[in-house]
């Protein structure tokens, strides 16, 4: 996408009631020099639509014929025009919003005045929300009253409906008073890709928070990529770590220096602390250093190299123990051969900079098969297999030789992996003693800690933690279904806690065409900082299945993980961390323990206001103490400063709808597992009603003019996100969803980083047959592939001759309309006739024409996690769907259209109507 002009919000911010989808804004945008979409196409594009319909009547067409925003509900506002790429509404291009600060050019001087007028005086020190300039530059002279916060812009949800483009806006700006940070650094406040608050203006009292009915929580994603090199942050190597004596907060950009710089006042608890003697000394150059250049005083996100006192024991090596299912199911679907080959091909990618990384292998059927792998250069290079059949008390036959150093045994590990498939290729064994294998693996790696990676195609049916086939199609869609989402065997929770205490993390890779009890197995990752990766109906004979797993597993093995990690959040006096959500073990009231700290998950922390806050700002500081893959103990510190307010309107105007939706996603999963599906769905609807009622009563004067439904512009997508959550695979009422699919969806709803979670709840849909001329091509400024504008998830948006991409981040659908013209099919699929088009899982052919290349570029770009500022190993499958093709596949794709009515659920129009009645 194009970079924002000047990097700061255009005049049409979240304000200007006309700003949402109004024709004036759209035409003004076009006049700004962007080609109007739909009409700007070359001859090819005209042909796609022109043979059957009038040109430019598709979803990306210009305004002609569409109702303006003031139309009745269901008449959507026009989708954003191509102009939106040059100068997006409210803030900045979302793809740029998380870019490193140097990516922004300094804004031209004109325009600052407009910005001041629009947002009030902004002393914002976050480069991702404001231009990089000294905070004082855009600030009005200090008045007795604090800096004005974000303005509240009321909208009517019925006459100005939600537009999907709003989900790409950055959160409401964090407006801090001038001079808040010790140095005027543009990176002093935490960027939203690491930490987002549900409220960017914090109520000073518990009673005001309670009155608002809004949650106060942080969405924390300490890492924005799988590898440090992809998202570098300042590292402070001198081991001079200055912390508050009382509250143990780390020195940060929001402290104040006293006594000629010899002491500093903590911005959390106000205690005065001494500045360490070495704080202003450059140990490398052996000379005094300039304090104003220290990263910990200029950057909200830093990493300290930790000295000895931060270690319970010396840093342990990275250990991967693979527990591989070798039963009949795993051999016949190709899992054994594919995983062995994939591990072999990824050995160079496994982090091993300190050459201490160790690997071990246990094969599992109704017995446990250990493998002793000799060092390279030994007389006998063949691996030895030792079989243990006692599943109740599995012992380690030769503990010393079962975990081997990758650097010392590299060749023999490869030899072993080459032979593994042959060893079991004729098996008829249907047993799977995975619970006993986990116990044995625990005994093997508990002394050092590490990761147990489970690859299984079977239900564990013998030994410890054995499970039975309990799925009953008759209870799906009934109140009894929720019991299937609970753990069937207490072993999985109690064993997970044991693992956590011994610094052992478990990741599950599950592949099955049969019931596998994901609900029970997913407890192991849930309490050990791991993840559950689910591949339903997987078979290596399908090339797409084999390639997807190979790419994901290779990325998984190459990810840099933190070991022996703990996470703690500290805050200004008066605030307390109340509840923590995510995959970890809560070791004490405020300490989360992670045997391994993953790079592809986010966490939610609910904040309570225990005492009245008297300061103009509050600070919340997240610290992750961990050992890197290279054996270095480090502390990653993320400091977020937020303004406080006594005014309910400020709280609502600064609320972040995506962070709020993320919080309620975690709450909903918790509710499903404790009370059931129906209570979780009802709680979401009740919350939507409560928020709308509160806003109407407290801020809209209690009256409803003309039967509307008032809500602030910055929260307009929230009711839609709640509906989309209720209709998500994990929560929706349906008798068609297999229990394993539902359980896997609940794992995603409680772990995905915010951008991926929002996309999983409300997928992206792009119209491809009439996409703008620049879509699918690299942007001139950034070199990034330009995506077409997203469109609302409604069948009203789909024309019968169209081609659409629907992408929820886990699965992609390429929807081919029943009247798609032959030229489109020829250009995209290389097929002259629609009847030859194969539906289902596939990859698009690489054809030598411009349109095919652009469509493939859009599909690939839509999969690109790094551009969203998150780490993820997932490579979505692409399913080709014909509108009049295979009914099951078509219905599955249509469940993504969350604004439509489908499978026992209401449409968006009905949902808004029911909210209106209840409010």
From Swiss-Prot:
Its main location: cytoplasm. Residues 244-269 are annotated as: Zinc finger-like. InterPro entries: ADF-H/Gelsolin-like_dom_sf, Gelsolin-like_dom, Gelsolin-like_dom_sf, Sec23/24_helical_dom, Sec23/24_helical_dom_sf, Sec23/24_trunk_dom, Sec23_24_beta_S, SEC23_SEC24_subfamily. Signal peptide: none annotated. One of its GO terms (biological process) is intracellular protein transport. Zn(2+) binds at residues 244, 247, 266, 269. Residues 1-46 are annotated as: Disordered. GO terms for cellular component: cis-Golgi network; COPII vesicle coat; endoplasmic reticulum exit site; endoplasmic reticulum membrane; equatorial cell cortex; Golgi membrane. Keywords: Cytoplasm, Cytoplasmic vesicle, Endoplasmic reticulum, ER-Golgi transport, Golgi apparatus, Membrane, Metal-binding, Protein transport, Transport, Zinc. It holds the Pfam family zf-Sec23_Sec24. Residues 1-38 have a biased composition (Low complexity). It is a peripheral membrane protein. GO terms for molecular function: SNARE binding; zinc ion binding. It comes from the Eukaryota. It is found in: Cytoplasm; Cytoplasmic vesicle, COPII-coated vesicle membrane; Endoplasmic reticulum membrane; Golgi apparatus membrane. Component of the coat protein complex II (COPII) which promotes the formation of transport vesicles from the endoplasmic reticulum (ER). The coat has two main functions, the physical deformation of the endoplasmic reticulum membrane into vesicles and the selection of cargo molecules. Belongs to the SEC23/SEC24 family. SEC24 subfamily. The COPII coat is composed of at least 5 proteins: the sec23/24 complex, the sec13/31 complex, and the protein sar1. Golgi apparatus membrane; Peripheral membrane protein; Cytoplasmic side. This is Protein transport protein SEC24.
């Amino acid at each position: 996408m194009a970079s924002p002009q000047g990097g700061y919000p255009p005049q049409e911010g979240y304000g200007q009631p006309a700003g949402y989808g109004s024709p004036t804004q759209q035409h003004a945008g076009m006049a700004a020099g962007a080609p109007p979409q739909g009409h700007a196409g070359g001859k090819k594009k005209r042909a796609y639509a022109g043979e059957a319909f009038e040109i430019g009547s598709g979803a990306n067409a210009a305004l002609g014929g569409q109702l303006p925003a003031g139309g009745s509900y269901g008449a959507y506002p026009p989708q954003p025009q191509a102009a939106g790429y040059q100068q997006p509404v409210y803030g900045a291009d979302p793809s740029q919003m998380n870019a490193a600060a140097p990516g922004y050019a300094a804004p031209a001087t004109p325009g600052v005045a407009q910005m001041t007028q629009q947002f009030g005086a902004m002393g914002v020190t976050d480069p991702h929300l404001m231009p990089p300039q000294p905070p004082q530059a855009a600030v009005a002279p200090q008045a007795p009253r604090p800096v004005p916060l974000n303005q509240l812009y009321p909208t009517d949800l019925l006459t100005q409906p939600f537009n999907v483009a709003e989900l790409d806006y950055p959160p409401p700006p964090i407006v801090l008073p001038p001079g808040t940070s010790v140095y005027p650094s543009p990176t002093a406040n935490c960027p939203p890709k690491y930490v987002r608050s549900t409220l960017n203006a914090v109520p000073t009292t518990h009673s005001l928070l309670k009155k608002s009915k809004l949650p106060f929580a942080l969405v924390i994603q300490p890492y924005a990529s799988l590898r440090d090199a992809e998202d570098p942050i300042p590292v402070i190597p001198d081991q001079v770590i200055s912390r508050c004596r009382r509250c143990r907060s780390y020195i940060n950009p929001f402290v104040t220096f006293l006594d000629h710089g010899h002491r500093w006042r903590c911005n959390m608890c106000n205690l005065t602390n001494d500045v360490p003697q070495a704080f202003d000394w450059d140990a490398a150059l052996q000379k005094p250093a300039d304090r104003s250049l220290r990263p910990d005083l200029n950057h909200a996100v830093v990493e300290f190299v930790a000295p000895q006192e931060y270690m319970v024991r010396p840093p342990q090596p990275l250990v991967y123990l693979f527990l591989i299912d070798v039963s009949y199911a795993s051999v016949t679907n190709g899992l054994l051969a594919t995983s062995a080959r994939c591990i072999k091909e990824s050995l160079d990618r496994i982090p091993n900079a300190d050459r201490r990384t160790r690997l071990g292998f246990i094969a599992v059927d109704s017995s446990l098969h250990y493998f002793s792998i000799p060092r390279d250069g030994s007389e006998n290079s063949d691996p030895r297999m030792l079989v243990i059949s006692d599943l109740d008390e599995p012992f380690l036959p030769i503990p010393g030789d079962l975990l081997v150093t990758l650097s010392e045994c590299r060749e023999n590990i490869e030899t072993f992996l080459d032979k593994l498939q042959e060893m079991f290729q004729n098996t008829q064994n249907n047993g799977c003693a995975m619970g006993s294998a986990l116990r044995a693996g625990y005994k093997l790696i508990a002394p050092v800690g590490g990761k147990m990676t489970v690859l299984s195609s079977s239900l564990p049916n013998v030994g410890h933690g054995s499970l039975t086939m309990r799925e009953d199609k008759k209870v799906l869609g009934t109140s009894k279904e929720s019991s299937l989402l609970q753990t069937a065997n207490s072993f999985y929770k109690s064993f997970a806690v044991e693992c956590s205490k011994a610094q052992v993390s478990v990741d599950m890779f599950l592949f099955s065409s049969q019931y596998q009890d994901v609900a029970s197995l997913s407890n192991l990752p849930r309490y050990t900082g791991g993840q559950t990766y689910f591949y339903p109906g997987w078979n290596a004979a399908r090339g797409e299945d084999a390639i997807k797993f190979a790419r994901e597993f290779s990325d998984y093995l190459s990810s840099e993980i933190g070991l022996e990690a703990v996470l703690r959040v500290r805050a200004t006096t008066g605030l307390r961390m109340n509840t923590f959500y995510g995959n970890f073990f809560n070791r004490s009231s405020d300490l989360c323990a992670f045997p391994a700290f993953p790079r592809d998950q986010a966490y939610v922390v609910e904040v309570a206001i225990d005492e009245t806050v008297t300061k103009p700002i509050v600070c919340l500081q997240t610290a992750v103490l961990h050992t890197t893959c290279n054996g270095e103990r480090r502390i990653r510190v993320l400091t977020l400063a937020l303004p406080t307010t006594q005014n309910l309107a400020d709280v609502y105007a600064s609320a972040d709808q995506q962070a709020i939706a993320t919080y309620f996603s975690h709450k909903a999963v918790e509710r499903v597992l404790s009370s059931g599906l129906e209570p979780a769905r009802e709680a979401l609807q009740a919350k939507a009603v409560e928020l709308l009622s509160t806003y109407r009563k407290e801020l809209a004067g209690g009256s409803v003019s003309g039967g509307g439904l008032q809500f602030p512009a910055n929260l307009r997508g929230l009711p839609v996100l709640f509906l989309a959550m209720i209709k998500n695979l994990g929560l929706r009422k349906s008798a068609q969803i297999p229990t394993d699919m539902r359980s896997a969806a609940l794992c995603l709803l409680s772990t995905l980083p915010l951008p991926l979670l929002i996309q999983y709840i409300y997928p992206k849909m792009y119209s491809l047959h009439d996409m703008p001329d620049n879509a699918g091509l690299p942007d001139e400024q950034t070199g990034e592939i330009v995506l077409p504008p997203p469109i609302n998830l409604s069948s009203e948006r789909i024309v019968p001759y169209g081609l659409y991409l629907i992408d929820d981040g886990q699965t992609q659908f390429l929807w081919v309309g029943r009247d798609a013209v032959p030229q489109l099919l020829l250009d995209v699929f290389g097929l002259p006739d629609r009847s030859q088009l194969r539906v289902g899982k596939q990859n698009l052919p690489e054809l030598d024409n411009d349109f095919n290349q652009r469509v493939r570029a859009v599909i690939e770009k839509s999969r690109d996690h790094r551009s969203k500022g998150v780490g993820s190993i997932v490579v979505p499958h692409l399913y080709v769907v014909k509108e009049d093709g295979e009914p099951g596949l078509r219905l599955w794709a249509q469940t993504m259209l969350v604004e439509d009515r489908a499978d026992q659920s209401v449409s968006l129009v009905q949902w808004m109507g029911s909210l209106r009645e209840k409010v």
